[in-house]
Amino acid sequence: MSLTTTQPPGPEMGPAKSDLRRGSLPHRFPAALLAATAAVVAGVLLAFSSFGFVLWGLLTAVAYVVIVVTASARVEGGRKARDRLVTTLVYGCFLLAMLPLVSVLWTVLGNGFARFDPYFLSVSMNGVLPSMDAGGAYHAIVGTLAITGLATLISVPIGVMTAVYLVEYAEGRMKRTIMFFVDVMTGIPSIVAGLFVVALWIILFGPGATNGAAGAIALAVLMIPVVVRSSEEMLRLVPQDLREASYALGVPKWRTITKVVLPTSAAGLTTGIMLAIARVIGETAPLILTAGSSAVSINWNLFDGQMMSLPVFIYSQVRMGGAVNYERAWAAALTLILVVMLLFFLARMIGRLFAPKAR
């Protein structure tokens, strides 16, 4: 009886390499290819006298994707080519998302910088005719900060405490009902909030009672659901282990919330509040109805007389027309953007200040 030993088949040594063993394109190849493609497409469009930034960008993107994917497939293999295709699409979507923001900032900066100076920020429109090359937005800046500040004082305690109730206490049908109405309030048009406050003010103070406090309440109606939803998400991110550790030490629930949960989520809560402020600081329709649109002097009293705000100031200047008024409107728009950026910077600082310190 003889035994035969069968050797296992060896690996096939074909000429084709695996995708994982293919070569790779040079590190700077994508950037160089993009620059070359953009230059070639621009030259072709200029040669046919049909150059346009939109058409140039579209053709450059299509040509770049086709060339880079084809080159990657031939040199690096199909797997790497698919990876480059998806990566290129992700970067392209990011650029498309950033394009409107950059365009808005560039347009506002280009048109508003000419009149944006200390004089514009330190004087009001009191005694200034629409055709005069004078006046500024100081009264509108004061009104914006005052109205938004009061709206924040109203909405933040209500919104944060509602979020605490939803996360720590509410259950079942009550929780679902509150969340449903919060979601409904999130989609309320701003003009509806303004009409609601106008109707309330007519009942309480009679017709024609417009002041900054009414505008603040209208903005608070818009802010509360945003604060609730953002605060709820931040409170849910607090690890349950921190709560359990506090309970194990005999700390009551209310003290656990105030000493553990809220400080731990302070940075996120601050960011959510700033998002809510950014959501309402540019509202125009409710403030026209509630705070008025004809104030030209500085008003420090939220409860007496009309109060101008930056969005309403922009609207009134554009409505009057004329080159000088348009310049004031652009400068006010730039001021509003800078105010929002400053508020976000302050929010970051406050969030870092109250965030729990690592030991």
PLM regions with names:
Residues T152-G172, R176, A209-A248, P252-V260, ...:
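Membrane-cytosol interface at the C-terminal ends of specific transmembrane alpha-helices
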Residues L235-R236, Q240, Y247, T271, ...:
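C-terminal transmembrane helix and the adjacent membrane-cytosol boundary/short C-terminal tail
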Residues K253-A291:
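Transmembrane alpha-helices
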Residues D183-L219:
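Generic hydrophobic transmembrane alpha-helix motif, especially the helices
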Residues L287-I337:
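Interhelical loop and adjacent transmembrane-helix boundary motif
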Residues D83-T88, I158-V197, I224-E233, K357-R359:
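Cytoplasmic-entry segments and transmembrane alpha-helices of multi-pass inner-membrane transporters
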